[in-house]
């Protein structure tokens, strides 16, 4: 019962869309109404408000970290509990019950989850994102590369462990890549927006 409650709680935590909440609190346009229509930090940045984008990034990462940390801290369900919390908070961000199941792509939330699973895993994945984003200026490309490398880092740090947490990392990476399928098409067509590019309603 504890595992079930923790999993539901993690999903509800993930369902809090900081892009929408922060934008509303600051009197800004709903990020689902412009740019990529994605309620995430990158699209909020396209709206031209760096403070809102930073708050969104921190909030989305924090909720991912919090959901997993709580399960680990209280020892709920061991590795199975951690894995379920990780997937649940991630799915909550992707399909939030509070926002008609229309959520973001999960990059910041996944980073928070990985930091809670193990700081080295989270930092290595975040650093990969930063390097690709810095040199290529594509948030989506950075996210895709980081998603590919997250399971690789997991194996490098912990070996070929056959446990629920490792499978949760793989599942999140696969879901993140799938959520970026439209971005992949735009990248291949040379139509993807770069980091910091202003919003358009088209």
Curated annotation (Swiss-Prot):
Repeat keyword on record: no
Primary residence: membrane
Q: What EC number(s) does its UniProt record assign? A: 2.3.1.275
What GO annotations for molecular function exist for this entry? Answer: acyl-phosphate glycerol-3-phosphate acyltransferase activity
- Kindly give the InterPro entries that the UniProt entry links to this protein: G3P_acylTferase_PlsY
Q: Which domain of life is it from?
A: Bacteria
Of which family is this protein a member? Belongs to the PlsY family.
What protein does this entry describe? Glycerol-3-phosphate acyltransferase
């Amino acid at each position: 019962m504890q595992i079930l409650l923790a999993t539901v709680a993690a999903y509800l935590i993930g369902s809090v869309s900081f892009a929408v909440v922060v934008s509303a609190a600051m009197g800004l346009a709903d990020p689902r109404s412009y740019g990529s229509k994605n309620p995430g930090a990158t699209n909020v940045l396209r709206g031209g408000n760096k403070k809102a984008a930073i708050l969104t990034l921190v909030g989305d990462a924090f909720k991912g970290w919090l959901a997993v940390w709580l399960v680990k801290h209280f020892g709920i369900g061991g590795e199975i509990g951690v894995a379920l919390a990780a997937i649940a908070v991630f799915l909550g961000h992707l399909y939030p019950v509070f926002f008609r199941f229309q959520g973001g792509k999960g990059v910041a939330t996944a980073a928070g989850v990985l930091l809670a699973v193990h700081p080295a895993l989270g930092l290595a994945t975040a650093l990969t994102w930063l390097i690709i984003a810095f040199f290529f200026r594509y948030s989506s490309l950075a996210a895709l590369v980081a998603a590919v490398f997250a399971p690789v880092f997991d194996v490098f740090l912990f070996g070929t462990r056959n446990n629920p947490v490792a499978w949760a990392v793989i599942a999140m990476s696969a879901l993140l890549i799938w959520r970026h399928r439209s971005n992949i098409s735009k990248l291949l067509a040379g139509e993807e927006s770069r980091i910091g590019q202003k919003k358009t309603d088209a």
